[in-house]
Amino acid sequence: LLDQILWMMPGAKITSVYADIRNVINEEVDDYFKILLRFDNNVTAEVELGTYVLTDKEQDKWFERHWIMSGNKGTAYVDGFDPEGKIVRTTRLLSNAGNGRTMTAAGPTRSFGPPAPGILTTEALPEVNTCHRDYFENYIKAYNGEEEFLVKISETRRVLALMDAVRESGRTGKSIAFE
């Protein structure tokens, strides 16, 4: 999941990493984690995985959350093992309700009311046609000098360094400066 987010953020540096890591069922397995990544381009990415996050909603998948990235112009998210997701953008920066208030089930609010019609636009994620086998076929060809590696050594090192920062944050409970 972390490598997917980094791949989608070419050129962006991670400024900080925060992680909450739990062992709910098995002490030897991190079966719950929530990771927050802040980038130098003002994007925040959240990755959450939990083997014990249960739902009884029929429309939800057993493993619902995959990842979500948000900035000041929109959000992209992917859910499920057979990932489905969308990009939701704003046509202009959202603002408070001004002098008015919106009534919600929790009471009145000036900030969390529904946006006016036409402000949010939704689009499909770009279609990607690949399979896991492609990676292994590339590895063999690249190892034999027939083509370049799809995953560069520098990309692998960056993900491993990020995983180390995630572990350190999970251990200390503190945000870790990165890159």
Q: What are the functions of these language-model segments?
A:
Residues 33, 119-121, 147:
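Short amphipathic alpha-helical segments
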Residues 33-34, 97, 167-168:
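Short alpha-helix boundary/capping motifs
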Residues 40, 88, 92-94, 124-128, ...:
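C-terminal helix-rich "cap/oligomerization" subdomain common to oxidoreductases
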